[in-house]
């Protein structure tokens, strides 16, 4: 691995990886819809994490698909994986923790298989891909759509959230990922919780904080995106900050807002532009929804605005990531701001 065989304690580690990747690293795409395409039944509160117990080979297949497509970073199937969630399905605490570790190990196994057997022509001159351990929000565990609103109720406190995330974070970090991706963060409070847990637990693995937005100005909760990004900027354990699971049409403006409060690399991996309806567990077309061609046509704009890591989230596919990788690697970026590359 580029990170020397395991996690390292070095400020700017992810920035260095981006530089080695040519100035812009490619993040993978959606997991759940790809698992369904391979035959997985995800009608469950655990969502894609269900496959950690029932079909880890399908998760490995999806990781391999993204590596073949040119991803520089693959994200573990732990977004919806929690100790409490697994226990509610009858697993013991020890079994639940082992399933969390498995999410990282399956991704690492896919990387090993790709290195030994895959078509590595797309990686010529690029560092080996990184494995990011995904940490989803408390709302993702609730599986009621509240990760898209940030509304956890007035009784939810910072200590409550710390107690929910602490052991899960410790287990995932102990599995040896290259970095930790705190994803689809809907509010400033949860970002503060993550930052404090990283410090309090002495976790030395580089991390990124990625928020979600419904309006291109604020996080899902209504907290201003610049205030949320400032939390990430103030945490020395956080190497990058950005947005995910957000409509592509909002990404450019969000990058510009985030740049005002941080010089850290910016990561963006939007969804397809469709809207998730929690009541029916469906994604529906909405204004601004884009196909792969239109989605990828925005990559240059995002890159010029300052994005240093670009990928896709819900409803994107290996085809999307392949097109992103092609756009990133073929385009000329003479006017890219130095902060995104150095």
From Swiss-Prot:
The keyword NAD does not apply. Its cofactor is Zn(2+). SUPFAM superfamilies: Homocysteine S-methyltransferase (SSF82282). It is an enzyme of class 2 (transferase). Zn(2+) binds at residues 245, 313-314. GO terms for biological process: methionine biosynthetic process; methylation. It catalyses: S-methyl-L-methionine + L-homocysteine = 2 L-methionine + H(+). Residues 13-328 form the Hcy-binding domain. One of its GO terms (molecular function) is S-methylmethionine-homocysteine S-methyltransferase activity. It comes from the Eukaryota. Keywords: Amino-acid biosynthesis, Metal-binding, Methionine biosynthesis, Methyltransferase, S-adenosyl-L-methionine, Transferase, Zinc. PROSITE patterns: HCY. Its EC number is 2.1.1.10. It holds the Pfam family S-methyl_trans. Monomer. Catalyzes methyl transfer from S-methylmethionine (SMM) to adenosyl-L-homocysteine (AdoMet). SMM degradation (by HMT-1, HMT-2, HMT-3 and HMT-4) and biosynthesis (by MMT1) constitute the SMM cycle in plants, which is probably required to achieve short term control of AdoMet level. NCBIfam families: PRK09485.1. This is Homocysteine S-methyltransferase 4. It comes from Zea mays. The gene is HMT-4.
